């Protein structure tokens, strides 16, 4: 996944 600051998002 990818992390940006305090938000982590699952790479799809």
Curated annotation (Swiss-Prot):
Keywords: Amidation, Neuropeptide, Secreted
Tissue-by-tissue expression: Abdominal perisympathetic organs.
Example of a GO cellular component annotation carried by this entry: extracellular region
Gene Ontology biological-process entries: neuropeptide signaling pathway
Source superkingdom: Eukaryota
Residues bearing PTM Valine amide: 12
Task of the protein: Mediates visceral muscle contractile activity (myotropic activity).
Family, similarity comment: Belongs to the periviscerokinin family.
Protein name per its UniProtKB record: Periviscerokinin-2.1
